[in-house]
Amino acid sequence: MKKKQIITMALAVFTLSMNGQNIPTIETGKNMPNQWIDRDTGHRVVRLINRKGDNSSFYFHNNPFVGNEMVFNGSNGEGKERESQVFAVNLKTGAYRQITHEPYPVRTEIVCAKTQEIFYQHADSVFAMNIMNGEKRLITVLKANNGHGSIACVNCDGTLLAGTYSTKEEEELFRKYPERHDWFNMLTEHPYQRWLFTIDTKTGKVNRFYTEVAWLNHLQFSPTDPELLMFCHEGQWHKVDRIWTINVREGKPRLMHKRTMNMEIAGHEWFGNLGKYIYFDLQKPKSKNFFVGRVDIATGEEKDFAIKREEWSVHFTTSWGENFLIGDGGSPTSVAHNDQNQWIFRFDYDGDHLKTTKLVNMKNHDYRLEPNVHVTPDNKWVIFRANFEGHTDMYAVEL
């Protein structure tokens, strides 16, 4: 018997009055009203929902939008991870509802807008759930004689999931060294064998189509080509040629950006929504000269756009027409080593560089939680997550 989906009314944030006289102009941070004008930028900021617990929008390259709704992960109660489930908020009305009602924690960022489904994994079982009616189906049970399989993304037409298999030896390394700073360098220097696989979402058939002794990670399907997958060689960025694509039917990898100098780094790559370009954070060399790189998927032609040190962001993303970019800033201890880039930024093209507009002052945000910006499909708002009120919540700033 299906559990009835709970629909709760929240703030109708995108239909609020534009009358600035009713909206306070204040510093962003601490206990905030439901909407305010950022004192330092003049841009309106709103809290997406009023819901107990932590509310977390997706990682920057995972598309959360289905129609008028945005899918997100939320904890029930006091923000305990073990109580997390999947929710959706209507960006037109402000209503939010719970999608999953599992007896175990569910966190996923795998969403197909075309089929209106989310995909998630519990132990070795892979499930799909219809966002609109809550219908759930088991797709497959991943079996590995020596290791573990994890799903990572779904293609644009919802026909294939992609993921990685790792060995028991690699899994044991994570158990033995739970802190990232311990195992990260180990895997860079001495990676284990990994496999890329797909799952047919209708039949459950699993296809291991590529393997390499490398830390294969950061999987993303093209938003327009259902057979084109991007993946990375994970590790210390100055030691790896990171960004690759592969046709999942053909199984032949293609390097999309090759480092050209010592200590050059390129990463946090993403597909533009139009499917023609791949973008990435580029530093030549690391911590010295900063760019956003853009490579044409068909031709391999690359163009790099310069930004200032104080404008660097942990993550960048593009608008839906790819005519401007958004960045989420960074902490003073990030790779840019600058105490002036704690902002949500807008970047507009200006020849071979990007000119910047500041949207939100993030000086009261702890960047151990990365904001991970998303532009709404109407290109009018930027959604981000933040903890400047003492817990993880979701906000939107008006462009």
Predicted regions and their residues:
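A short helix->beta-strand "capping" segment at the edge of beta-propeller domains
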Residues: 36-56, 356-360
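Blade-loop segments of beta-propeller domains
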Residues: 54, 58-61, 81-126
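Loop/turn-rich, solvent-exposed surfaces of beta-rich toroidal or solenoidal domains
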Residues: 272-293, 301-355
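Asp-box/WD-like beta-propeller blade repeats and closely related beta-sheet repeat scaffolds
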Residues: 102-194, 208-211
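Short, conserved, GDST-rich strand-edge loop motifs in beta-rich repeat architectures
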Residues: 22-28, 75-81, 163-191, 232-240, ...
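Blade-level signature of beta-propeller repeat domains, shared across WD40, Kelch, NHL, RCC1
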Residues: 369-399
